[in-house]
Design a protein with these regions (language model features):
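Catalytic-core regions of core metabolic enzymes
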Residues: 1-640
Length: 640
């Protein structure tokens, strides 16, 4: 006969770790053809330089892609001096990557051709999918099913493309003509237009990128996949994200928490307001999450949140060039008082400390600074300070052990050679300590055009900003990230005495009886007891006499609170009366609550009152749970 066997599969830490490793390795292998292709087919390549297909081919050639290029166009024999092919099937050699810019109706055949020719990765530039409504979403679902059915991966649709600045690859598989300098930062953007702006800004600011991906509608490859690739990419030290939505927030949290332990992740989240969320939904067909949920997600996973793209770049420059601060003590060295005041204010507003230096350190500074200089911190060298004063001041402070980070504020007066000052800053920091170097950020002001000073500092990997608040903001966020990284991983405790099944039965019974809503006071007491959470004695009283009797039983002084499944904020309707010393006070409290509800025509909302003894000591807490449509259950926990 048949035998039925039931196996209980319990996840262990080791099992979960092995599963995550397999997922990571498989994801990295599947994304490699996007970033390290030996050959690229441009499907929809065109002789028209203004068309998307023409721009794609031009960008690949302008970047000097090191592999083979195959333009695909059924109506051309050659394009820009390259032999063209009528279809991907007609290409004589294997193509690792296909960049596709054809009308949506033509995509199914192109995907079949790519699969037949062994293409492993697709970048679909074409728009007209989930971002345009239900019909487009159905079209996107069919496209994704086809791509996955053939075992391929896809970036897009509705995207700008991607690039890799590795000198051995030099891939610009996008329709952006901008190829930024090579560097240690990788970025994923959910907006193609913002991607264009980011690439332009990166080139202007000399911000080196390792790779860039415009994910578009994220039908297949998402930021979650890219995080895993960049986690192991030796050319990537900092990860930048522009997010409008989270396809799978729990997976993002799991991956980001692990990656952020090794490499900083800086994210700008679009759609913070109702208007922004509506715009995000129509832009890439994505369900935008509530900002409170996003803030909690980033904070718990170590993701550094930037409020603007400008802030994203400011953080990126510092994280890519400087060590993380070991603490929150900041030393400010300046030649002007006003900027130092603004900087110090922003430091303290961001949770940083601007401590007064010790008498010993102040005496060392006084030995070479004029009597009018400020020595306490900020250190004001005054306007006449030269490069040597900056060098000596930084040497003393860096070696004092009284600062975890340095901010240098310089207002140009025209008399100081910019390059000499830049070198003095470098030398002062380097000669000040034999320990690990302190992070140093510079604000350089007062010049119409960028001079050799900021350029020299950038060459020395010392970030330069235009306004004094910016380095303070950057340090406050990098210090918070350093604190997060220093925290222990923690563990989930195993509670073996909880009767959670009883709690679930109580909740199901309440829903079956009355539908969705708030649990009654009696049911809530039972649920908390099932979870082994201690509850103060007392109970529900439906009448004034019951309330008086219950108060005698639990002992005075007592608290009387409205019991209601519909009134959530009891204090707003006078539903909480505290520190009642006798029976008469309890009766008056019952009447007061009842009469207030009657005055508001809400007497039917009163189920009675809860009577409990007053307690002292401990900490009053508030715990709440809500169900976010995207994130699932969210817990609010804090002071009551």
């Amino acid at each position: 006969g048949d035998m039925e066997v039931e196996l209980s599969l319990l996840s262990t830490a080791a099992g979960v770790e092995r599963s995550e490793l397999r997922e990571r390795l498989a994801t990295i292998a599947s994304l490699r053809p996007f970033f390290q292709p030996r050959s690229v087919a441009v499907v929809g390549a065109s002789r028209d330089p203004a068309s998307i297909g023409g721009r794609l081919l031009a960008a690949l050639r302008a970047a000097s892609f090191t592999g083979a290029l195959y333009p695909v166009n059924p109506n051309a024999q050659d394009i820009a001096g390259l032999r063209a092919y009528p279809s991907v099937r007609a290409i004589p050699d294997p193509a690792d990557l296909a960049v596709i810019a054809v009308p949506p109706h033509a995509l199914p055949v192109v995907v079949e051709d790519c699969a037949a020719r062994g293409v492993r990765a697709l970048v679909v530039i074409t728009a007209g999918f989930a971002e345009v409504g239900a019909e487009g979403r159905a079209r996107q679902d069919r496209l994704l099913a086809s791509v996955r059915g053939y075992g391929m991966r896809m970036v897009g649709p509705n995207c700008l493309g991607l690039l890799n600045t590795d000198p051995s690859v030099r891939l610009n598989a996008s329709f952006s003509p901008i190829f930024p300098p090579a560097g240690c930062m990788a970025m994923a953007s959910q907006s193609g237009a913002l991607g264009l702006a980011v690439l332009a800004a990166a080139k202007r600011l000399h911000l080196g990128l390792s790779t860039f991906v415009s994910v578009g509608n994220k039908a297949d490859v998402s930021s979650n996949d890219l995080l895993q690739y960049w986690e192991e990419d030796p050319r990537t030290d900092v990860i930048l994200l522009y997010q409008e939505s989270f396809g799978n927030p729990r997976r993002f949290a799991r991956i980001a928490r692990r990656v952020a332990r090794r490499k900083p992740i800086v994210a700008v989240k679009g759609g913070r307001t109702g208007a922004g969320r509506r715009a995000a939904g129509s832009h890439t067909a994505a369900l935008a999450a509530s900002d409170a949920a996003v803030e909690a997600l980033f904070r718990q996973t170590g993701v550094i949140r930037a409020d603007t793209l400008e802030e994203l770049f400011a953080l990126a420059v510092a994280l890519g060039a400087q060590p993380l601060p070991k603490g929150r003590r900041v030393a400010i060295v300046t030649n002007a008082g006003g900027p130092a005041i603004l900087c110090a204010d922003r430091c303290e507003a961001g949770g940083l400390l601007v401590p007064t230096f010790s008498e010993r350190t102040q005496a060392q500074l006084a030995s070479f600074l004029p009597p009018t200089a400020g020595l306490a911190n900020p250190v004001d060298l005054i306007a006449s300070a030269g490069a040597e004063e900056f060098r000596q001041a930084l040497r003393v402070i860096a070696g004092s052990g009284e600062a975890d980070a340095l901010i240098v504020l310089y207002v140009s007066a025209g008399a100081l050679d910019p390059q000499s000052l830049a070198l003095a800053i470098r030398d002062g920091i380097a000669s000040g300590t034999d320990q690990a170097p302190l992070p140093v950020l510079v604000c350089w002001m007062g010049e119409e055009e960028q001079t050799s000073g900021p350029n020299e500092l950038a060459r020395l990997n010392i970030p330069v900003y235009e306004f004094p608040e910016t380095p303070a903001l950057v340090l406050s966020k990098t210090a918070a990230y350093a604190d997060w990284r220093a925290q222990p991983l923690g563990m989930i405790p195993d509670f073996d005495d909880l009767d959670l099944e009883q709690a679930r039965r109580l909740c199901r019974r309440a829903v079956d009886a009355r539908g969705a809503g708030w649990l009654s006071a009696e049911a809530m007491r039972e649920v908390l007891t099932s979870a082994r959470l201690p509850v103060a004695p007392g109970g529900l009283a439906r009448t004034m006499d019951d309330a008086a009797s219950l108060a005698r039983r639990v002992g005075f002084p007592v608290a009387v609170k409205l019991a209601s499944r519909t009134v959530v904020h009891k204090t707003e309707v006078g539903g909480v009366v505290l520190n009642l010393q006798d029976v008469d006070a309890v009766r008056r409290a019952f009447a007061q609550i009842r009469d207030r509800l009657a005055l508001d025509n809400r007497l039917e909302a009163m189920d009675g009152v809860i009577v409990q003894p007053m307690v002292s000591g401990g900490v009053e807490l508030m715990v709440g749970v809500t169900h976010d449509p995207l994130f699932g259950p969210l817990i609010a926990f804090g002071l009551g």
